[in-house]
Amino acid sequence: MNLNFIVPDINMTFGDMKFMGLNRERYVYDRENNKRTDVLESRIYNIASAVQGGQIEVTIPEYAGAKEIPPFADIELKNPKISAMATSQRDSTYANVMWKLEADDIVVKGGSSVKPAAATGGNEKK
């Protein structure tokens, strides 16, 4: 059985979370031509975690859109997953583990990631 990702208990793992802002954008890499493309793959945001005791990065897919959340606003992560990748150097007995936090979306606490439908304007009185 392969371990693909871990679904964390939000309160125990992160506690209260605050939005800190955009860290960087990640673009699709064309391995065939060995260069970065102009196609946006994901955005990486910084969030503050009360339990972790500092700032952590969360990766959000491109389709979630850019986040216009005020700094230090209380936030929630939608469907968070933690994955790990270990690397070691040749002939070494040590490994470096890199943890990656991904989520489907970041929303203001109590809010929703679903955007309201646009008004049709058909019911307006003239």
From Swiss-Prot:
Pfam families named in the record: DUF961
Top-level lineage group: Bacteria
Name of this chain's protein: Putative uncharacterized protein YdcP
Organism: Bacillus subtilis (strain 168)
Primary gene name: ydcP
